[in-house]
Amino acid sequence: MQHHYADINGIRMHYVTHGAGEPIIFLHGFPEYWGAWKKELNDLGKDHYVIAPDLRGYNLTSRPQKVEDYHIKHLVEDVRALMQHLGLKKSSIVCQDWGALLGWSFLLRHPDLVTRFVTINITHPALFDRELRENPRQQLAAQYMLVFASPQAEPQLMGDDFAWAKQAVINDARAHGAILSEDDVAEWVASWRQPGAITAGLNYYRAAKMGPPDGEGHPGGSNLLEGLKPDQYVVHTPVLFIHGEQDTYLLADGQRGLKELVPNLTIRRLPDATHWVALEKPREVSQFVREFLRGQG
């Protein structure tokens, strides 16, 4: 794999490329970095040109200091500017967790730039907001978002040498089949130890005003759809939704109504996968993506 930097949209973005062929951009989540996709990049890079950035604020990409610097409009522009830097007129996108919220937001604003779209566990933002506003089960599952938005988040996540992140990501994924070497774990921890990286990741939640009702006037939802009209919510791009059915953060209720907003929809389910599907089931993810991009799934 080759490592690169691009000076785009006011930041210096680190990204990795591999292979040749039709492009696929991979967008990671929180608290991740480009290496969350390492196995998929190695596999799909055999017959595609794969690109995996460290998103704004993460790992080796620069970190603006203000919360508002992580507003969705800036994140979307980062992806568009990276494509321009790479000379890509269109690309498929594969994304998970916060990367999928960004991916959907990019797709809704720039449908002409996306060939095919793969989201893991994250539903359409309109349905995501509905669930946060109206569904008590999802509201309970999303209480962590209120913690992430609070000043207490950094000490909780960074305390005892990132014990929370190690348990929530590494240990949980390993318990569900992820094969992560000690070198892999060291790379993850090194990404968290980058000064300001955890705060930058938390600022995604803060800038998006994302979460369930907070009891202090926030009705729940997010600002991810800001500036869009309802008629822009319908997606005509082919979409693959990969669902890890044991995800306790993002409930399946959010899929209700997805077919109406995404007529060209394919769903593939992994009954024993959790939130960390790309780590737990890289072979299956690569297979699903390859078949979908070939028009077979």
Short names for language-model regions:
Residues 263-297:
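Catalytic active-site module of serine/aspartate enzymes centered on a nucleophile-bearing elbow/loop
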Residues 26, 52, 241-243, 269:
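Hydrophobic beta-strand core positions in alpha/beta domains
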Residues 29, 71, 280-281:
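Active-site helix-initiating loop/hinge in glycosyltransferases
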Residues 16-63, 82:
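Conserved HGGG/HGGXW glycine-rich cap/lid loop of the alpha/beta-hydrolase fold
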Residues 4-8:
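Short acidic-hydrophobic surface loop/beta-edge motif
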Residues 20, 245-247, 272-274:
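Acidic beta-to-alpha connecting loop that harbors the catalytic carboxylate
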